[in-house]
Amino acid sequence: MTPMRKTNPLMKLINHSLIDLPTPSNISAWWNFGSLLGACLIIQTITGLFLAMHYSPDATTAFSSIAHITRDVNYGWMIRHLHANGASMLFICLFLHIGRGLYYGSFTHLETWNIGIILLFMTMMTAFMGYVLPWGQMSFWGATVITNLLSAVPYIGTDLVQWVWGGYSVNSPTLTRFFTLHFMLPFIITALTTLHLLFLHETGSNNPLGIPSHSDKITFHPYYTIKDILGLLLFLLALMTLTLLSPDLLSDPDNYTLANPLSTPPHIKPEWYFLFAYAILRSVPNKLGGVMALMLSILILTTIPALHTSKQQSMTFRPLSQFLYWLLITDLLVLTWIGGQPVSYPFITIGQVASVLYFTTILLLMPTSSLIENYMLKWT
């Protein structure tokens, strides 16, 4: 008799996605981050829902409602810190997931890759809005500085900023709309994640060798379900260690001070996962130019499939490209460090050099190195 999972319309969907899914037999631990991102999304949604039950999106009560959650709600401190550190863990998994896609050439699956970039944008938007909600000093000034960038848009810039703010400054209307969007966006992200998976299962997963693996595939369950559970346990160990032993390690002390429009913090900066883009923004002296560089630092990912000049999909057997790949990763780490430093010499110069190197590596050096490798292997 045919198992129910193969006949029931609902179970058939789950079966084709998680149980009988044909999967390459040689995918490594770098392929674990997709499932970890799914776990992150579930954790963030659940903790976020519990926080929303006690949160008050108003400039006069937001800060005290966070204090109330932390002090008076049962396990409120834990839910709050799980949510804040869960965002950091989500971005770590997200960056590693994108890094794996770049290294092993997963960007050749165009629909999956482009939906992934949209997901990255939406996750960044959601995280930024979430950072504003505690209504501390860094929340307020971060919101003021980042939303002010819209004023760089020609003709409609000023009107656009006031429209986003809901007034002439960041205040209660801004907080209310940010809370609404922060609540709504994760559900759109969940829908897009389903699309991301749908397109991935149309083409099948890539593998470390970057070669077709149709002749050697195994079922997802039990092999990769066990592997994903191990990854999930290690992920939960890291998240709980961070949350229980050092919950404020990745947050800013300024956010424990109530937002004050009359007092500017000495150094305004976003959360650590935005620092690389913030450094690129600051390295351009012109406001509009900076905003464009900021957008391009993420949008450049859409050009990667077009810039792929190698005859090989993966970087596994391409030492020159590997060197440039790790140069790019190092450059991003330097940009992250610079984004957290004050705007003074020598940090300005280092940031500008690192920003130029970031774009040059992706747009020029990597495609050129691929052509050199093709020539050396006589694959021209």
Curated annotation (Swiss-Prot):
Entry-linked PROSITE patterns:
CYTB_CTER, CYTB_NTER
Q: Indicate whether Mitochondrion appears among the record's keywords.
A: yes
Query: What cellular-component terms does GO give this entry?
Result: mitochondrial inner membrane; respiratory chain complex III
Q: Which residues bind heme b b566?
A: 97, 196
Residues the record lists as binding a ubiquinone: 201
Q: How does it sit in the membrane?
A: Multi-pass membrane protein
Entry-linked SUPFAM superfamilies? a domain/subunit of cytochrome bc1 complex (Ubiquinol-cytochrome c reductase) (SSF81648), Transmembrane di-heme cytochromes (SSF81342)
Q: Which InterPro entries match?
A: Cyt_b/b6_C, Cyt_b/b6_C_sf, Cyt_b/b6_N, Cytb/b6-like_sf, Cytochrome_b, Cytochrome_b_C_euk/bac, Cytochrome_b_N_euk/bac, Di-haem_cyt_TM
- GO molecular function per UniProt: metal ion binding; ubiquinol-cytochrome-c reductase activity
- Report the cofactor remark: Binds 2 heme b groups non-covalently.
Asked if the Swiss-Prot or TrEMBL record annotates the protein with the keyword Membrane, the reply is: yes
Tell me its cofactors: heme b
> Which sequence ranges are marked TM in the entry?
33-53, 77-98, 113-133, 178-198, 226-246, 288-308, 320-340, 347-367
Q: Where in the cell is it found?
A: Mitochondrion inner membrane
The UniProt subunit note reads as follows: The cytochrome bc1 complex contains 11 subunits: 3 respiratory subunits (MT-CYB, CYC1 and UQCRFS1), 2 core proteins (UQCRC1 and UQCRC2) and 6 low-molecular weight proteins (UQCRH/QCR6, UQCRB/QCR7, UQCRQ/QCR8, UQCR10/QCR9, UQCR11/QCR10 and a cleavage product of UQCRFS1). This cytochrome bc1 complex then forms a dimer.
Q: What's this protein's family per the entry?
A: Belongs to the cytochrome b family.
Additional remark text: Heme 1 (or BL or b562) is low-potential and absorbs at about 562 nm, and heme 2 (or BH or b566) is high-potential and absorbs at about 566 nm.
What is the official name of this protein in its record? Answer: Cytochrome b
